Design a protein with these regions (language model features):
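Glycine-rich flexible loops
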Residues: 1-471, 483
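Substrate-binding pocket helix/loop in short-chain dehydrogenase/reductase
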Residues: 562-575, 692
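Active-site loop immediately N-terminal to the catalytic Tyr-X3-Lys motif
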Residues: 564, 612-618, 699, 717
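Active-site helix of classical SDR
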Residues: 586, 623
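Residue(s) in the substrate-gating loop at a strand-loop-helix junction
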Residues: 607
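Short, small/polar-rich loop/turn modules that mediate ligand/substrate recognition or access, typified
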Residues: 639-643, 722-724
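Short C-terminal tail/terminal secondary-structure segment
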Residues: 711-712, 723-739
Length: 739
């Protein structure tokens, strides 16, 4: 049925994005994909990766040619906002119902997952979601199970069932309530029984969990879902507005005016501390909703209670780290407060694991928090990559919305029996504060360390050698720097393309993003002659990723001197850019790496010219000789945490900005190499590169990609025992052999 309130005019917060022109050309499976993408495109409807959508579709059985009812359901670990047709699992509905006969009770819940592949329709190998029986056992053609903040606020309220009835009366709905139960076959049985006993109900609120809605057509299901969530929003928002400034006990800490600058100052320190188990990438939020929470009187207690929705604490862990710090314009004492709070957090996490782990539980994971809350500043979130770090922050923002809504729904009345309580957990197991109900730690553990969640982790592809690392490539807009940025992206790094040429940097960044993802690469403008410009570029990197791990500099100049005479200004500029700038870069990076207290790496670019003197290139040759020695000096001064190495390439012509057309033509003329004036720049560079190659033992032209491979070998973990070293990349120049 379609509710009478449903119309575009009746939606206050959400938007009906359904397009009949698009929908009419789609088959049922594509309509499911379309419906899912529309719902998942709005984080108010469900969080990233959260919830599930399904359809029961009549299809021709490939085995016997007869019609079969097939359950299409989002595959395990998928995101409905981006899912495509191939991301859905398909199961024979009758086989899924038959599997229910094998169910031996809640203690044997996990063994039922092995039944899902036996129910697969056709050759579909997509892992079915743990929610599969929940959708399969409900007698509706199309079902949405979502985690809207407004819905979870109701589900996590101590008076949630009472408020649900009030909502039903106001909006003429027939929602029903189920107590908390971990997803799986047991919950599916509870759903089936509840629907059977409540004819005409139009939705289900799962205590401490989420919302179920449905429809007999794809369109009807979408509208039913949209309407109920929007009306829940109206209901909860009214209570929030009525509470006003007294929400969360009111504000006790003022937001600092320089909060972003302070966040950048402290970010590397926090990143280093939460990376003691495994290196993390960071994200920062100082949104109004985050600041209202972290600056409130009840923030510390509510944060310690933990989150309520299973989807939340898979990423945020059972609780965030709240740092009880009195905000000031300086960071006085904050580092000490963070260290103290972290010790307590790790001890509590170990106690949590030891209290609930069974002999067959997965081993304890990283004890560090993934969310850090600091009054006056905001929220720092962490993950294995930028996207995960950002999403983790979004999930905790969802948790803040839930706590806001649940506390706003409160009337000040205590509840002897919680509506979330049921067979899985009694009232006394739940923690309650200001009407907000957090899941019992035992139930949180059963989700976080569920074998099915462990299986999701194991299905993820192995991480690459530069995963979780932030690599800054100075001079990344062209030539060797461009090749290095691309290869770093291929090896899993978060790549920062730093260049004076903003357009070139953007071009390389776009290439790196195609390889590693949009959030895994960024461009920054930098002038290595200016210490303040370097500092600002590095702070921009910290603001985005939380810190830095590897610095690579390929930027250099070769002074033009047609008459063979180097002017004083050229000499000074060459040494400033080719030598002193390397020292500036290292000098600005050093305090960042010290704050992180993680292993770091620097790779500089010297040249074969450092040991092979040539007429007319004195300034360049001397500068590169100095770079070679600077590598050794920095290796000593930055040890033991930071390794410093370099490469000594022979002439790299391909893609090099140091070889403009006029210089290439001059060199071709000098060496009496025939060429066509109509040839392109790269064709001319190719002729010169071939000439240089013939002077080496291998006769191989030195390409940017060759230099990049050597650079990244030195930068990465494969060379963890190498520092103060230079690798020749010269094809075999005998006069440049190391002696």
């Amino acid at each position: 049925m379609v509710f009478p309130q449903k119309s575009k005019e009746k939606l206050r917060y959400l938007k009906d994005r359904w397009d009949d022109q698009v929908a009419k050309s789609l088959d049922e499976a594509e309509l499911l994909r379309y419906r899912s993408n529309l719902l998942g495109s709005d984080l108010r409807i469900t969080n990233f990766g959260g919830g599930n959508t399904s359809s029961k579709i009549e299809e021709k059985d490939p085995l016997d040619g007869n019609k079969a009812t097939v359950l299409w359901i989002k595959g395990s670990g998928g995101d409905i906002g981006s899912i495509q047709r191939k991301g859905f699992a398909t199961l024979y509905l009758d086989k899924l119902h038959a599997a229910a006969k094998r169910y031996r009770g809640v203690e044997f819940e996990d063994e039922m997952v092995d039944m899902y592949p036996l129910c697969a329709f056709g050759n579909n190998t997509v892992a079915a979601s743990i929610d599969t029986p929940l959708h399969g056992f409900l007698p509706f053609a199309h079902i949405d199970h979502l985690h809207p903040d407004w819905g979870i606020a109701l589900a996590a309220a101590a008076n949630g069932r009472e408020k649900m009835e009030e909502f039903n009366r106001r909006f003429e709905h027939r929602l029903i309530w189920l107590p908390w139960q971990r997803p799986g076959f047991e919950l599916a049985m509870m759903l089936r029984q509840a629907i059977s006993a409540s004819k005409g109900c139009d939705g289900i609120v799962l205590g401490g969990h989420g919302l179920f809605t449905w429809g007999e057509t794809q369109r009807e299901c979408y509208l039913n879902t949209l309407t109920i969530i929007d009306q829940l929003g109206q209901f909860v928002a009214q209570h929030v507005e009525e509470k006003g400034n007294v929400l969360f006990g009111g504000t006790v800490s003022a937001a600092l005016e320089n909060q972003r600058e302070l966040a950048i100052d402290i970010f590397p320190f926090i990143r280093g501390r939460v990376s003691t188990g495994q290196r993390m990438i960071g994200s920062f939020s100082n949104s109004a909703e985050v600041l209202r929470f972290v600056n409130s009187a009840e923030a510390q207690r509510l944060a310690h209670l933990g989150t309520s929705c299973p989807d939340h604490f898979i990423r945020t862990k059972i609780r965030p780290l709240f740092v009880a710090w009195e905000p000031s314009s300086m960071l006085n004492g904050l580092r000490e407060k963070i260290d103290e709070a972290l010790k307590v957090y790790r001890d509590e996490y170990k106690q949590y694991y030891d209290s609930f782990a069974a002999p067959d539980s997965p081993k304890m994971r990283d004890m560090n928090p993934t969310v850090v809350l600091i009054p006056g500043i905001g929220m720092f979130s962490f993950g294995k990559n930028k996207t995960e770090a950002r999403i983790t922050g979004e999930f905790y923002t969802n948790a803040i919305h839930v706590m806001e809504g649940a506390t706003a729904l409160g009337t000040g009345k205590a509840h002897d029996v919680l509506p979330q309580a049921g067979p899985a957990a009694k009232t006394e197991a739940f923690a309650v504060h200001e009407n907000y109900v957090a899941l019992p730690p035992s139930e949180a553990f059963r989700i976080e360390y569920w074998q099915l969640e462990e299986a999701k982790i194991r299905r993820q592809p192995p991480e690459k050698e530069l995963s979780r690392r932030v690599v800054v490539v100075v001079g990344g807009g062209n030539g060797v720097g461009e090749a290095t940025a691309r290869q770093a992206a291929e090896r899993g790094a978060h790549v920062v393309v730093a260049d004076r040429d903003a357009e070139a940097a953007k071009k390389t960044t776009a290439e790196a993003q195609k390889i590693a993802g949009k959030e895994a690469a960024m461009a920054v403008s930098i002038d290595i002659r200016d210490r303040e410009a370097i500092r600002e570029a590095f702070r921009e990197v910290i603001a985005t990723y939380g810190g830095m791990d590897i610095l690579i500099n390929t930027a250099a100049i070769f002074p033009s001197s047609p008459d063979g005479v180097i002017q004083d200004g050229q000499w000074g500029t060459t040494l400033d850019i080719n030598v002193t700038a390397n020292h500036r870069l290292a000098d600005e990076l050093a305090p960042i790496l010290r704050e992180q207290n993680l292993d770091g790496s620097i790779v500089l670019t010297s040249s074969a010219n450092a040991v092979v003197p040539k007429r007319g290139s004195e300034a360049y040759d001397v500068s590169k000789a100095a770079v070679s020695h600077l590598v050794r000096e920095l290796a000593i001064s930055l040890a033991p945490k930071v390794r410093v190495n370099g490469i000594s390439p022979a002439t790299v012509v391909k893609g090099s900005t140091m070889f403009p057309r006029d210089r290439v033509i001059a060199s071709l003329t000098k060496y009496e190499i025939k060429f066509d004036f109509k040839a392109t720049d790269e064709q001319l560079r190719g002729l010169l590169a071939e000439f240089y190659a013939k002077r080496t033992l291998t006769h191989c032209p030195i390409d940017p990609e060759d230099c990049a491979a050597a650079i990244l070998f030195l930068a990465g973990p494969e060379s963890r025992c190498t520092t103060g070293h230079l690798i020749p990349v010269d094809g075999g120049l005998t006069e440049a052999f190391l002696r």
